[in-house]
Amino acid sequence: MIQVDYSNNESIKAALTGVHVVISTISGAALDVQGKIAAAAKEADVKLFVPSDFGGITEGETEGIFGEKSNIQGQLKALGIPYAIFYTGPFADYIFASYVF
């Protein structure tokens, strides 16, 4: 177990050093951190980044959580880090949603 300070790029980079593949499972409430993780992954020479974009197709979306996920795809392209997106269908959006009871 490695403790990471997501507000500190060096902390994220240190945690990712020597890692070949990052599979992000960040919830919708924390998607803003995913860009920082991707940037640190690029600096740490991670070979493949899988963003937390499981569910329906989000490419080109501009609104809400789908817009945020689309923005991450743009950031990954700009960083030049290899990435893979697994579209599993819209049902996954409901299964993995954060619910407050």
Model-derived segments and spans:
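Oxidoreductase cofactor-interface core, primarily capturing Rossmann-like NAD(P)-dependent enzymes
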Residues: 1-17, 29-35, 40, 44, ...
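Redox-cofactor binding/interface segments in oxidoreductases and associated redox assembly factors
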Residues: 21-27, 51
